[in-house]
Each structure stands twice: as C-alpha cells, then as structure tokens.
Amino acid sequence: MLLEHNAIIKDFRNVDMRFASCYPNLYRSAMSSLGFHIIYDFLNSREDTYCERVVYPMSKSLETGSPLKDFDVVSFSLQYEQDYFNVLKMLKNGGIPVKKHERTDQDPLVIAGGPCASSNPIPMTDFVDLFIVGEAEAVMDEFIDKCLELDDPRKNLEEFLDIEGVYLADNPVKMVTVNDLKDACHPLRQVFPETDNKDYIPAFGRSFLLEVSRGCTRGCRFCMAGCIFRPRREMPLKELLKIAEDGCQKTGLKKVALIGAAVSDYSKIEELCEGLHEMGLQVTTPSLRIESITENLLEILKVSGLKTITIAPESVWEVRKAANKFITDESVESTIKKAIKHELNVKLYFMIGLPTETTADMKDLVGYIDKLIRLGSRRNQIKLSVNPFIPKPHTPFQWEKFDTKSIKSKAKYLNSNIKIRSFKIENPRKAMLQYVLSMGGNELGELLYRSVYETVPMKEWADLSPNYSLDSELPWKNIDVGMDPEFLKGEYKMALNKKMTPGVRNLDVTTAVPANRTCF
C-alpha cells in the first residue's frame, strides 16, 4: 500500500457531493501535475464536497477505494491526447457505461478539463457529458453549486450552459481564466508519496510545486499553450516567497519546482531564486527560455541545487523564422557555454517537420546539433531530444498536415548522421496518432470506443488524418479561446514566407486580465 503525506480524509456520508478527480496516466505523472493538486485542494476546501483521486490504471479512489460508479461527478484531466484511451478504460473498469447515451440517472456525471478539453474536446464528446474550457478555479464553485441544485444533472445538461466556460457538444463556449493569480488556488498541503520506488516518485522528485505565472508572451506559431492561455499573468514576488515558505513548512519539503509556461520570463526570476535559496530551499524548473537566461540566474540556480537546464532551440535559424522563434544561433551557443561554465548539464529539445523545412535545413540541422554537442566539456553533458512537429488547434499551424512518410525519412536521416548515444526521436507512428486525436472531430468516436475492446490498426487512424485548408470548417469552431481566426490565418501565411511577428512581451505584464481578452 502506498503511503502518502497530506492526503485528505473525510467521511463521505457527511457530504453532499462526492467528486472523483481522475488522472488518466500513471501516478508519478499525476503527482507532477500542479493542476491535479489544485482541483484536489480547491474542492476539498468546500465542506459540502469530498474530492478523491483516481489514477490510471486503477479505477478506485486512493482515499477510500471507492469505484468510479459510486461518485456523483467523475472528472478527467486531459493533459495529453494519448490519454483518451485510458479515460475510456477507467470508465469501463469503474462500472460506468463508456458511451454517454448508454448511461442512466444512476450513473455519475462525467466531465473533463485540461489543455485538450480547452482546445479541442470534440473527439471525446461521445463519452464526456460536459467539458470545462479554461482554468478550473474560475468555474468549479459555480459548477458544483449547479450540480447540487439539480435533482438529476445528467438529464438537465442544458442548465449548465448558463455557466461561462462549460461546453456541451454543439454549443458555443468561451474560455474562462482566473483574472488575478492572487485569487487562484495555490495548494500548500500538497500530497506527495513516501517511497523510493521510481515508478511513484514525481518528475520533480520530492518538490513543492510553485506556480509563478500562467500564459506566455513569445508568440511561437507551433505552441498551443502559448496561444490559448493568454494574456500572461504572474504572481507578485512577495506572495510567491510566502507561499513557498508556508508550503514547505506544511510539507517538510526542501526543494521547490517553479511551474509556468515561461518560468524564466518571470519579471523577478533572479530575486525569486535568491529568496528561495536564502530560505535554504533547492530550486528546479522544467525548462528555461534561452532569451531570459543570464549568468547571474545560472549561478543562483546552480547554488540552489539545479543540475540540468533544459532549453529548446527547436531547429535551425531559417526554420525558426517560420516558427516565429526569436532566438539566434549565437544566443543558443552562448547559453550552452554559460551552463558549461557553471558545470551544469544541458538538455536540448528540437523538432522536425516544421513548416518550410527543407532537405538543406535537415543537413544544416545535423551540423548545428554536432556543433552544440561539441560545446560540452565532458561526455554526455549535453543530451538531445527530437520530436516530430504536431499541428495543434488554435495555432497558426493548425492548417498544416502531418506527413508521416516525411517524418520517418527525416528521423532516419538524423539517426544515421548524429553520432551520440544520448539521443532519441519520438516514434513517427505515435506522433501521427497524436495528430489525429489532436486535430480530429467526432468521427474519431467509434475508433476510440473500439480501442477499449480491441487493437485498432494504425491504418484506420491514418485514414482519418485530417487535411484542412484555410477555408475549412474546423471541428473546434465553437470553442472561443480568445484568438482571432483571421490573425491566425495571417500568421500562417507569414510563416510560409518566413516573416516574423513580434510577440506580446513588450506589453505590460500584470496579475490581471483585461476585460476584452481577444488577442491581437
């Protein structure tokens, strides 16, 4: 039995709402997700609600061992499209009919949130009753109140349309966000496991998760998170240090993981890291923006316990121009040299298959990677990860098609020409499947359902690979995330001509969201 610290135990007989927060991936991934902690803490702050966690491959709660069918609401966090398969398995194994039209008033209300639900929930509409589009704290209180108000929520789904941010299939919805991050949920008593088993240890180890900002100002044309979670908001330094101090006191943890789409863009990142170090805390972060890394920041992170920095050059300069990635080769090399100087390891992320990429670009990429690897002062100090580019909804590249044959050829070329061991490329077939799930519509429902009971041949998924033009009606047309479609079309055309657009990082960054949040 797994021992956890800070798990919340209530008597479910004394609450009005039993809520299952489900993570359709492994425990270590679930406990690395700040959003999963936020839902747990936020809902359990209500006396009338008991939120329990259910983590794949289990279909019973960690707190009381209750099957999913025993809950009033079953909620799934959709972080990755490949997790859709696990959602359906968890429903089946939890005693809930997989297809929503087969459920009765005796079954729970099934909802979903997270990035995939906010960008394109359409492939899952055969299985999920309602979706939360946006940031949960902005809507969950009103949602729970509505559930408790209705005698049978599943028979009255239209009643939820009064709540901004709740999506019911075939209805328009506008994404909701927390206006001021000081009003967001910042869990202090975060749950963490007491174990040495690597299968259960979160990605950041025994760390307190500290959210410094939401959103991004960089304007990369391939990045869904950077497009839909706008505008950028950040927490004041004083509040962050107080949260870290209180959280680490309540958990006993000695390391802080900084969380945000663009952590190193935080306006007081050096002061934050210095403050945490002065508290005697180690600091780690998932990745850093090359443009924001300074000698002083690396020195602070080094003395705070960081061993590896992760940066994303993405490709060579000619391709970066199409992607609107404002970093030069010189800045990448300079950053790596700074890291080596401070005896830090470096992990580099690249993509293949970005729009405008040519055979000549691939040849240049091999030479560029070789040049960067040679900057290391010792073996394996610089590691490499290469992923196929996958178009995403609500981005300028949503009209691009995924070319499996081309990706396979490029992956083979890199494998033959990059001579280092610490190098991996994501499987192109898996990337194709992710593309279909990310960009498809409700035509995927039947294959998803079949996948619960049998292995669906990859060819059948490939046959449903979309091919959108600028005039196509997109499946997510009813999902308003605040991005002007005409702006996206203009950006796509500029990308094909390798023209760059300044990001929004010159705008004032505050904790508040403007009333009109349509971008550009």
What are these regions, as identified by a protein language model?
Residues 1-20, 27-28, 169-209, 491-494:
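N-terminal [4Fe-4S]-dependent radical SAM core
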Residues 1-8, 19-21, 28, 417-520:
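Radical SAM enzyme core and accessory elements
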Residues 21-22, 82, 242-347, 351-381:
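Conserved SAM/AdoMet-binding glycine-rich loop
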Residues 33, 201-238, 515:
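Canonical Radical SAM [4Fe-4S] cluster-binding loop centered on the CxxxCxxC motif
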Residues 36-38, 126-128, 147, 227, ...:
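Short secondary-structure boundary/capping segments
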Residues 48-58:
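A short beta-strand-loop structural module common to alpha/beta enzyme folds
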Residues 56-173, 396-441, 450-455:
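Glycine-rich beta-alpha loop elements in corrinoid/cobalamin-binding modules
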Residues 267, 296-297, 320-324, 352-360, ...:
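Flexible glycine/acidic-rich beta-alpha junction loops that bind and position SAM and/or redox cofactors
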